[in-house]
């Protein structure tokens, strides 16, 4: 748990002397710490008892004893006789587990047991005689030099400062991590995870080769089982869809569908039989018969084209031409070559 932090901006007679940053022990005294935090922010509005803003802003340190403490928080009377908590007039003591064993501690002021309001004090030395009587709820984490300056302010015979030592501004500080802090944390976590993974891999690699082979075989078996299960699941889904569609249909529609399926199956059977018979007849025929049938099936145009392609065209010879010579009985006709 991260404890909240608040701040006081201190002015002496209107002159800013610095800022005090305070950590509240919300993990040990949450009720007391919440009272102080809310009075620093002023978020609770007007008090039910005093009808005044529940806010430390503008209040003064009305009592300062050098070598002991600086007391403030009376925003109702500004004399040490007033004050109001966010819970009402006062609230009980929460815990005395923290001791007044050092300087810079924040403790609740009271008029006896269970009379805490809004008044508090900051110690400037260890004060063990206050243990068990006042609740310690915070500590100064920065700006203790400002507390020392307040401690050295002149006071009258009633320990009231001669100058106006006022809380000019106060509030809660929001924890903001630096830009690279989150990345560093994430990288640290990732590095740890990578180290763990590497250690696991090393431990696995240190095992026998036989165990690794067995593992690989088992993995392959699992994969094959998964593939088979997927195939079966697809088939089951299709069957379920068919069954669901059949259930949704009326009995007459189911009969009609079954008839159509029977007709389709009969047509398929007849087609298959015809194909088989035609194949058998083709096997019985000679190749010349097949060629003749193929030629018959062709159109006359295709036949003429086949003939033209098969026989090259030759120019006719003019027998009246004196250059044409006939050899033999007249079958071999040729033109003389020069």
From Swiss-Prot:
Enzyme Commission number, as recorded: 5.2.1.8
Gene assigned in the entry: cyp11
Record function comment: PPIases accelerate the folding of proteins. It catalyzes the cis-trans isomerization of proline imidic peptide bonds in oligopeptides.
UniProt feature, compositional bias: Basic and acidic residues: 243-309
Organism phylogeny: Eukaryota, Fungi, Fungi incertae sedis, Mucoromycota, Mucoromycotina
Database matches in InterPro entries: Cyclophilin-like_dom_sf (IPR029000), Cyclophilin-type_PPIase_CS (IPR020892), Cyclophilin-type_PPIase_dom (IPR002130)
Pfam annotation, one family: Pro_isomerase
Residues covered by region (Disordered): 186-338
Any one cellular-component term (Gene Ontology): cytoplasm
Organism: Rhizopus delemar (strain RA 99-880 / ATCC MYA-4621 / FGSC 9543 / NRRL 43880) (Mucormycosis agent)
Protein name: Peptidyl-prolyl cis-trans isomerase cyp11
């Amino acid at each position: 748990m991260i404890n909240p932090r608040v701040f006081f901006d201190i002015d002496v007679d209107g002159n800013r002397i610095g800022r005090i940053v305070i950590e509240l022990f919300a993990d040990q005294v949450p009720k007391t710490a919440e009272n102080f935090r809310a009075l620093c922010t002023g978020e609770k509005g007007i008090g039910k008892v005093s009808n005044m803003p529940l806010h430390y802003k503008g209040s003064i340190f009305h009592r300062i004893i050098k070598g002991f403490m600086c007391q403030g928080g009376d925003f109702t009377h500004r004399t040490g006789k007033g004050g109001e908590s966010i819970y009402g007039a006062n609230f009980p003591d929460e815990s005395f587990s923290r001791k007044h064993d050092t300087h810079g501690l924040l403790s609740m002021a009271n008029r006896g047991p269970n009379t805490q309001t809004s008044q508090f004090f900051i110690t400037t030395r260890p004060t063990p005689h206050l243990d068990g009587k006042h609740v310690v709820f915070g500590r100064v984490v920065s700006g203790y030099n400002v507390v020392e300056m307040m401690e050295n302010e002149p006071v009258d015979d009633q320990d009231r400062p001669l100058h106006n030592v006022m809380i000019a501004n106060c509030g809660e500080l929001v924890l903001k991590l630096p830009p690279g802090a989150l990345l560093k944390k994430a990288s640290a976590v990732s590095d740890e995870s990578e180290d763990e993974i590497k250690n696991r891999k090393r431990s696995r690699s240190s095992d026998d080769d036989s165990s690794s082979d067995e593992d690989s075989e088992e993995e392959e078996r699992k994969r094959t089982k998964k593939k088979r299960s997927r195939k079966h699941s697809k088939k089951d889904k299709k069957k379920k869809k068919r069954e669901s569609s059949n259930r949704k249909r009326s009995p007459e529609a189911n009969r009609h569908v079954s008839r159509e399926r029977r007709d389709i199956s009969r047509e398929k059977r007849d087609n298959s039989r015809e194909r088989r018979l035609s194949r058998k007849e083709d096997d019985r025929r000679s190749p010349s018969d097949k060629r003749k049938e193929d030629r018959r099936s062709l159109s006359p145009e295709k036949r003429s084209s086949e003939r033209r392609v098969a026989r090259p065209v030759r120019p006719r010879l003019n027998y009246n031409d004196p250059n044409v010579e006939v050899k033999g009985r007249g079958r071999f006709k040729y033109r003389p070559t020069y």
